[in-house]
Regions:
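Outer-membrane beta-barrel proteins
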Residues: 1, 36-42, 53-55, 80-84, ...
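Outer-membrane beta-barrel translocator domains and adjoining extracellular loop/strand segments
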Residues: 21-30, 74-83, 117-124, 157-163, ...
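Structural signature of outer-membrane beta-barrel domains
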Residues: 9, 16-20, 59, 70-74, ...
């Protein structure tokens, strides 16, 4: 694993090798049309990943852009599984923070993830856009938030799991589209720390 950070830019890359990984697999029960799930040891699996994150500041506008690359390789030797070839997955995220005033802030989060094959599950691409507004009162002690998630109803759950001589699929919407409101109160806005009276110093010195 390699991590490099310079000012508002960070880079991360890594490689994992797992010997005898436990993988969730669908199996036919006694050759009948009955499928059950179980964990099975495979020979080995490998993962590679790269991530770049940029979080500059432009006065009242604070963006955070992230690009991720991941790819997994599972050895299925000895199993009757007809899964697609391994392919890379890319994840794009853009978090936008707008400091409209000292007490009013707006957040716009956009995310897109390409299709990927992880172990035995192939997941299709999905996207999501969220928006949020916060307003603070009483010197930031009271914070009111209003949010809306998955504005365009694009965060769908679509996957195919390849098992031992069988295939399972799911294509649906998880009903993540919603609006809501939050209210929070911060009891220690000054971030003061209680230092104590030193009553335990004698015991600590003894130990």
């Amino acid at each position: 694993d390699l991590n490099v950070v310079y000012d508002w830019l960070s880079f991360n890359a890594g490689y994992n090798y797992i010997d005898k990984p436990m993988v969730w697999i669908a199996t036919l029960y006694q050759g009948k049309d009955i499928t059950f799930m179980r964990n099975v040891n495979f020979n080995h699996s490998k993962d590679v990943y790269v991530s770049i994150v940029a979080s500059p500041r432009f006065g009242w506008y604070n963006p955070m852009a992230e690009i991720d690359y991941t790819q997994s390789f599972l050895c299925i030797d000895g199993f009757d599984i007809n899964k697609p070839t391994n392919r890379p997955c890319f994840n794009f995220r853009l978090n936008n923070r707008f400091n409209i005033t000292s007490t009013l802030k707006a957040f716009l989060t956009m995310r897109y993830k390409t299709s990927r094959l992880y172990d035995l599950q192939y997941s299709k691409q999905f996207a999501q856009v969220d928006v949020k507004f916060t307003k603070s009162f009483l010197n930031d002690a009271l914070v009111l938030g209003v949010y809306a998630n998955d504005l365009f109803k694009t965060d769908k759950e679509r996957w195919t799991m390849y098992g031992n001589r069988n295939v399972m699929t799911k294509d649906c919407y998880g009903y993540t589209r919603c609006v809501g409101m939050t209210l929070s109160y911060n009891f220690n806005t000054a971030k003061s720390t209680y230092k104590g009276t030193g009553a335990g110093n004698t015991e600590k010195n003894r130990l």
